[in-house]
Amino acid sequence: MAGKIKKGALVRVVREKLENSLEATASDTRFPSYLFESKGEIVDMNDEYALLRFYTPTPNVWLRIDQLELVE
């Protein structure tokens, strides 16, 4: 599925993959609910990460592509 994820796609964050990640152990694990309950748009990408914009007044966030799933 990660091969289908591209710039401009709408995605959701997979809670289990984010909460059990190395990045989660290095930061506050009280993730805001909008990460899991709303769609995010990919605004930029590199090899392993995607920059997500959520339609809430929050900063964009970089997450690993394997922590995302496409919204259909």
From Swiss-Prot:
The keyword NADP applies. One of its GO terms (molecular function) is quinone binding. Its EC number is 7.1.1.-. Keywords: Membrane, NAD, NADP, Plastoquinone, Quinone, Thylakoid, Translocase, Transport. GO terms for cellular component: plasma membrane-derived thylakoid membrane. It is a peripheral membrane protein. The keyword Oxidoreductase does not apply. NDH-1 can be composed of about 15 different subunits; different subcomplexes with different compositions have been identified which probably have different functions. NDH-1 shuttles electrons from an unknown electron donor, via FMN and iron-sulfur (Fe-S) centers, to quinones in the respiratory and/or the photosynthetic chain. The immediate electron acceptor for the enzyme in this species is believed to be plastoquinone. Couples the redox reaction to proton translocation, and thus conserves the redox energy in a proton gradient. Cyanobacterial NDH-1 also plays a role in inorganic carbon-concentration. Belongs to the complex I NdhO subunit family. This is NAD(P)H-quinone oxidoreductase subunit O. It comes from Gloeothece citriformis (strain PCC 7424) (Cyanothece sp. (strain PCC 7424)). The gene is ndhO.
